[in-house]
Amino acid sequence: MPKHHTFATKLEDLVLTSMSFRMSKHQAHPIEPEDVIREESEDFYSDEEEYKETWSRWALQLLSSSPYDLYLIVNENFESINWDLKAKTLARPLGGTMTFLFFTVRLLQDNVIKPNYHKINRTTDGFDFSRSATLREYDYFSKYQHGASWSSANWRVNSLSILDTLLKCLYILLLVSNSVLTYKFLFGYFLKYSLFHSAQPPASNNLTKKSLHDLAYRSATDVSRGSLWTLIRYTFFQRGRVQEEKPTDEFYYEIKKWCPSSFLTALFASFPPISVWFMAFSDITFVSLLPVILTQYLFWYVIFDCYEDRIKDELAIFKGMAAEYNNKVMKPKLSAQTQDAMVDATMYGQEFVQFYPSYSTARSGVFITHSLCGDVIKEKYNQRTKAFEDIPTGSHSQNIIRYSRNERLYHSVFPQNPLKKINGAAMSVNPMSFNRSPTYGGRYGTPPSRSHGSGQTYSSTSAPTSPMLKNRRAIPTDHSTGGNISGGNYVEYTSNDVHGEPPRRHSTSPLKRDITSSAGREDNHLAFGVNSPNIRSRTVDVKKNLHTHTTVVCPKSDLDTSQLSSKQSSISPFKLSRRGSIESRPPFR
């Protein structure tokens, strides 16, 4: 953990720091000051002085501690060791040493102690003549009162007696150690898992059914799968309390998984009980060393190498499956890119929109805290540097807005207009009138010509949405209303559409009139075009009734039946009943 930091005044700079106690935005203190004290002490103490001080402090602490404190210290140091990493470096040599030590004990017992057993255990002091005054009066028994010469002459027998006692102690100690190791390996390490969401019972021999309401309930099946002492206790002492297994609506399954540690497995494989009990109940010679070595190697290969490697391979496969599921299913669903935005929602807004990094979501990985001064601290953990970084605060956007293909073509072909035009509808609204309805140039809702006056203003409010046309033919002439930027001739489109409005198909018929009234006259002229950029020719004006009849000249095969029926359809007489004579419209077809 780093030392005390003094952060820079520029908030844009990223400052590497750890999770710390923040006094203010520019001042932090580490949560664990022991590392800081250790680093600061290096400036005042040398390595030798620090070493002596540490040992002296440890010795003083050891002398002033109670026995229970010593027990806690030893237990904590023992549990803090990662024994699984020492399976091959410590457990295997230790188990092999114990196996060959037991072989040596049995070899000495069968070949050294057993032939001299009658000399070691014979009764040398059947009668003590020195304790009887009557026997001491006879000269014949006086020679048996001095036994010092006999004891010094039989030193070999005394040595064998001491060796026999030592071998018996080692024999019992190794047998007990192997028995405890076998019991711990087979019955000492289990983990219990509760399955609350399994509708069907899994196929497992270690599965028991538990009740959610009565925690003391144990079925007969559960008792039969317990230990021998549990079975005896329930059979003779608590037989009446054992209930039959009854199906209930609310229950769960419990699996008792056998999981010995790798260190214990390696010790069991290198000090197997089969080899120990084989040597305990058979006469041992040097030839017996061959089956002992073979048994030990076979146990190590089957139990530790094959079985442990199989578990590691299965874990690797499961991790690969989980990683594939995470990358293909979970990440696309749960890691959607988000972005915070601030948009002006007033009726007279000026298209104000601003984007911010998505810090409000739970998946952003940003830790937001407050200092003692009330400053908001935003920190994010950097996997590359393995440290926390201060996130710069500001109003600028950190995300990239990606446009679609049509939008990229539109922005690259047409110049950007600062005024807002949505779906091709240019809207004129007085900001002070709070009128949200669009104002078009045509009387019947048809948008006006693309040549707008310089004094016309546009509104930032949204226009009515209408479906975009999709070009179904890559033909030079685009007959859609306003063209289609995804296909067609862009040269003709850009030459006619000077204002760069996006393509839009309006809901009005192309045969509706575009009526322009002049001052002091009732004459109107009807437009049969919709300002398409691909009009090739126009007809002459009808001079009698002062109407303009605009038609589209194009190959007949290029138009669909729906387009022909739309462009060649007749006008209802009711539409022109209030605008003059019906004879001014084109003939019916």
Swiss-Prot record:
Disulfide bridge partners, by residue number: none
Compositional bias per record (Basic and acidic residues), positions renumbered to this chain: 511-525
Topology versus the membrane: Multi-pass membrane protein
GO cellular component, one term: nuclear membrane
Keyword tags: Membrane, Nucleus, Transmembrane, Transmembrane helix
Function noted in UniProt: Member of a perinuclear network that controls recombination at multiple loci to maintain genome stability. Required for rDNA repeat stability.
Descriptive protein name: Nuclear rim protein 1
Species in which this protein is naturally found: Eremothecium gossypii (strain ATCC 10895 / CBS 109.51 / FGSC 9923 / NRRL Y-1056)
Protein encoded by which gene: NUR1
